[in-house]
Every structure is written in C-alpha cells, then in structure tokens.
Amino acid sequence: MSQLVECVPNFSEGNNQEVIDAISQAISQTPGCVLLDVDAGPSTNRTVYTFVGQPECVVEGALSAARTASQLIDMRKHKGEHPRMGALDVCPFIPVRGVSMDECVLCAKAFGQRLAEELNVPVYLYGEAAQMPSRQTLPAIRAGEYEALPEKLKQAEWVPDFGPSSFVPSWGATVTGARKFLIAFNINLLSTKEQAHRIALNLREQGRGKDQPGRLKKVQGIGWYLEEKNLAQVSTNLLDFEVTALHTVYEEARREAQELNLPVVGSQLVGLVPLKALLDAAAFYCDKEKLFVLEEEHRIRLVVNRLGLDSLAPFDPKERIIEYLVPDSGPEQSLLDASLRAFVREVGARSAAPGGGSVAAAVAALGAALASMVGQMTYGRRQFDHLDSTMRRLIPPFHAASAQLTSLVDADARAFAACLGAIKLPKNTPEERDRRTCALQEGLRQAVAVPLKLAETVSQLWPALQELAQCGNLSCLSDLQVAAKALETGVFGAYFNVLINLKDMTDDVFKEKTRHRISSLLQEAKTQAALVLGSLEARKE
C-alpha cells in the first residue's frame, strides 16, 4: 500500500483567476502530486487547494506553489473577509494512507525550513508540529493577522520557528503543521434553524460554554437553515473521526431529534472523505443490525443508505473518497495492477524483483481467498442453513487476510528496492559510510518485516481453516486442500526470505528473536496444514 499524504494550502487570492490557475499548475506539474480540488472564495479572497501524494512529493508540490505565489501575490494589496497573515496563510499536512502523524510532522518541518530558506520569510509551526503549547492552534498564531505582524515579530514570544524575525510586507508570514483529516458532515432536519442549533450545542465538544460542555469530543457544530434545500442542518466538523466517528455523530443527532419529535432526513458530506471513515461506519451498522456484508463496495453502499448521504445530491464514491481518486501505487507501476500473465512474466524476467517474497505473498493470498470461497459456497444454501451463523463467523477472517496478503506482493518488492537503494549510496567519506549503513539496516528491517507479517497473518487463520475443513461444503474439498498447502507454502517462502535478510543485520538480539519466531511459525504451518488435510481426508472417506 503506497503512502498518501494530503496537503491543503490556503493562499490569499480568491479573485484573480490567472493567479489561481498559476498556483494550480505549479502543484499539478510537480511529479507525484495529484490536485484534487481548488476552492476559490471571492468574498474571502482566498483559495484552498487540496492535493495528495507521497510525503516527499507533497512537500515539493507545496514549495512549488509557494514559489509561484511569491511572484504573484502582494499582501500589501490584500483585502478579504477571512482571517489571514500571509500570501500562503496556512499549509497543513494530513495523513491519509500508510503514513503516521509523525511523518506528517516531518513533512511540515521540512517544508517550513525550506520555505524560510528559499524565500527568506517567517514560518510558524502549529498543530501536531507545534514546538510550544501557545502555538498549538491556528487562531492563536494568527491573532492580529497580517496587520499586526510588524510589531508581533519584534516580540520574543513570537520569534518564528523558521526564517527571519523581520517583516516581509509582500508575503507576511506562513503557518504550517500537521493535523488529522477534518470531515465536514451535516445532518438534515425538517425543523427550524433554532432547533438544529439546539441539537448542535448539545453535541459539539464546546457545548454551551465551560459549564455546559457537549457530548462529542473533537466535534465542532452549529445549526443553520439551508435555504436552497428548504431544510435545517446540524452542521459539524469532525476534527478527528477516530475519536468521534461519522456514525456516532449521526446516531446522536437522530437521538436528539427524536426527543424533540423532529424528523432526520439524511445527511451530507462536504468535500472529500477518507475511506476508513466510511468503512468504520459500515462496521458499526453491520454489527448493530447483525448484517453479513463483506465486499467494500457493498459496505459503502450500506453506509450511503444508512446515513442518507445521497439525500441532497448523488453520492459517487469514486468522486468523494480520497483513496479512490488516487491509485494505490507509488511512482512505479503496482504489481497488483498487472494481469496474471504480466505478473508471471515479470517474475520470470531477468531482474531480482519481484522475487520469492512477492510470490510467497501471492500464493498465501490465493490460499486465503480459496478458503473464503469455500465458506461462501457453503453460506446461504438451503442444505447448509444450520451452518449460516458458523460461516458468518469463519468467512470474514479469510476475506480480510486475502486483502492483507495481496498488499504484501507490492510491499516485498518495495522493501527490496529500499535495500538496493541503500547499497548504491556513496561511501567515500565516514559520514557517507555511516549514512549508508543506517539506510541499509533500516532497509533490511523492512525486508524482514514484510515476510514476517505474511507468516503472522497466516498464523491467525489456522483455527478457522480447521473448523471450515470439518463443516464446509464437501464438494469444495479439493479447493480447501489447495488452500491449506498454499498457506503453508506462503509461510515456507516467508521463512527463507526472513533468514536471507537477517544474515546481513547487525542487531544480534533482533536477529535471534526474529529467527526463533519465524521458525516457530513455519513449524506451526507444517503441523496445521497436515491437520487440515487429515480432516479433509477423513471426511472424504
């Protein structure tokens, strides 16, 4: 799974289309950056850009946009309704896929330092990247706005994190940092604005003030009336959907509305949404209603229905889910995008990758998929009605493991590429040799981690496979036999891939611990596969 970071720079220009387009072009032409949205506000005189890419790519994209803005925006002439303190007012980095918050903090720091050095402008860090508590929030840093900067920069407490403490009239100052993904989510009500606002006050974390806090953490809220749709909305911002989820906000709003005898008529997501936010909601409704829904497409359709996301306008997942707008591949083509014929051809080509690690992952993924298939060939059939609850329990682990193992096909090739890249680093000076050694050891750790994860994933499947072998559709007997051997073979491949990469590692404690773990996982795979095959043979007789 490729890494994906979202960057949302806010530039202080919302009227001059030539400037807006020039900044868009600067982002779009940066390799590895995908521009998803450009939202220009004439009255605020501000444009919000949304683009994504791998960490190093989005830093370059933000810098390219800033360079362009420095030539075209003059803050001495800027007027607008939105608070601002610079030509590039704020530039947050947000983790979307395969990236930690710490990595986004590094993005913000790298961007801030390079921006300050290149343009010689003051830069502040906020959010998760803040260096001091007083700079945690954007409003705190932006207090007084652009007009206050000449005096503010003279104060010791407002020395920039990067760049000069001198006022740059044409630019102002920039704030950059890292934060969680913000989701704008509105619940529709057939009510008055005041009733909607009453619900919002009960829900939002701020509540009605310090003495009357609301129920939902990391949620902002207000009630308003949407004239063009002739209904009211509880309008919320979810500052961290992993603290308070979409479905939690919706269900709590419904409960509040029910107490006031008000009808809820769906909801609205504004802008883009992370896939995980919808899948978390799907898991909630599947659990609540005891539903058996496996496919991602079906789970999203369930959420659209339960939350009424299409009540005001069609909700097209391909246009609204951020991961769907960007292919899950890095700068190079993903092996998973290739046809089976092309994948086999590439394995057989005169190159070291994809190699045994990717093949082991593919074989294990097929083994898990076969087990899932057998479960589904048993589930929902009249003669196996008595097994429905059992299959509902057994199928999901195989379905999930198949997807996880499939992702390791690419992960193994990427880990090998990282090792190869480290080996090719220069080693002419002591510093270069140290840097190369560190990079190589880190690359080897990744090259060990991928096959170890394969073996650990398969290890979780043996109990379910044993049970499936004893009660699954007997007409699929050969499929389960192949599944057992495929899973065992995947672990067999993982074992040797771990050992070959451990050989060049220098951490003896890690080597011994990992060698012991992978050996036990291989022995377990051999034993469990034999037991599954024995159970199947006994049933055949």
From Swiss-Prot:
Pathway listed: Amino-acid degradation; L-histidine degradation into L-glutamate; L-glutamate from N-formimidoyl-L-glutamate (transferase route): step 1/1
Alphabetical UniProt keywords: Cytoplasm, Cytoskeleton, Folate-binding, Golgi apparatus, Histidine metabolism, Lyase, Multifunctional enzyme, Phosphoprotein, Transferase
Localisation per UniProt entry: Cytoplasm, Cytosol; Golgi apparatus; Cytoplasm, Cytoskeleton, Microtubule organizing center, Centrosome, Centriole
UniProt entry tagged with the keyword Chloroplast: no
InterPro entries, sorted: Cyclodeamin/CycHdrlase, Formiminotransferase_C, Formiminotransferase_C_sf, Formiminotransferase_cat, Formiminotransferase_N, Formiminotransferase_N_sf, FormiminoTrfase_cat_dom_sf, Formintransfe-cycloase-like_sf
Region annotation (Formiminotransferase C-subdomain) ranges: 182-326
The protein's Enzyme Commission number: 2.1.2.5, 4.3.1.4
Superkingdom of source: Eukaryota
Tissue distribution of the protein: Specifically expressed in liver (at protein level).
Binding locations of folate: G163, P164, S165, S166, F167, V168, P169, S170, W171, G172
Similarity comment text for this entry: In the C-terminal section; belongs to the cyclodeaminase/cyclohydrolase family.
Protein name per Swiss-Prot or TrEMBL: Formimidoyltransferase-cyclodeaminase
Taxon lineage: Eukaryota, Metazoa, Chordata, Craniata, Vertebrata
Gene expressing this chain: Ftcd
